[in-house]
């Protein structure tokens, strides 16, 4: 797992007092510990465990997950990735992004996928790499304000499985919702 930033760095290098004022958290709540917690959540889900998913960190604001092709092949003789694995990895990347951000913001929430639309563009013959982020710039801030005010919120997410060339093999567009843990 690659961890590139501390929480303060992740929050745009705000002065320490600004981070602690805007994010109720403990000093031990770093991006590294939040990413490790997310990996443990994935390991605790038997279907996800069988996919061999690894959290690869935040890259340009997007959560990156990886999974080996060998654990996610379909029934075809040419052994390309199973479409269900592509859908699962993109859904988990989107769910994971929102879960991670809520944890970093000091909230313990249950996150659910409300709906999603998938598009399969090309077969995948290599290890799977998914990136997920909000569909609209600034939507995280609006989501967080709504969550704090109403105790629930939804956000549009987009995810992509990229080929080694960088071209999209599959895309997901979906809405995810969060409620406080009970």
Q: What is each PLM-predicted segment?
A:
Residues 1-6:
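Extreme N-terminal basic, low-complexity initiation segments
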Residues 17-28, 124-125, 135-182:
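HotDog/MaoC-like acyl-thioester-processing domains
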Residues 50-81:
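Catalytic strand-loop segment that frames the active site of acyl-thioester-processing enzymes
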Residues 97-137:
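Hydrophobic beta-strand-centered segment that forms part of the acyl-chain substrate-binding groove
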């Amino acid at each position: 797992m690659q961890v590139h930033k501390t929480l303060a760095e992740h929050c745009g290098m705000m002065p320490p007092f600004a981070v602690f004022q805007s994010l109720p958290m403990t000093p031990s709540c770093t991006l590294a510990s939040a990413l490790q917690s997310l990996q443990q959540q994935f390991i605790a889900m038997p279907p996800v465990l069988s996919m061999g998913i690894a959290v690869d960190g935040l890259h340009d604001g997007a959560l990156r997950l990886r999974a080996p092709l060998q654990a996610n092949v379909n029934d075809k003789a040419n052994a390309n990735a199973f479409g269900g694995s592509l859908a699962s990895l993109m859904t988990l990347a989107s769910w994971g992004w929102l879960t991670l951000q809520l944890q970093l913001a000091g909230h313990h929430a249950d996150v659910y996928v409300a709906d999603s639309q998938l598009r399969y563009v090309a077969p995948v013959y290599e290890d799977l790499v998914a990136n997920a982020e909000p569909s609209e710039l600034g939507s995280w801030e609006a989501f967080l304000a709504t969550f704090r005010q109403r105790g629930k919120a939804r956000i549009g997410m987009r995810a992509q499985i990229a080929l080694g060339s960088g071209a999209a093999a599959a895309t997901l567009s979906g809405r995810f919702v969060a409620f406080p843990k009970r």
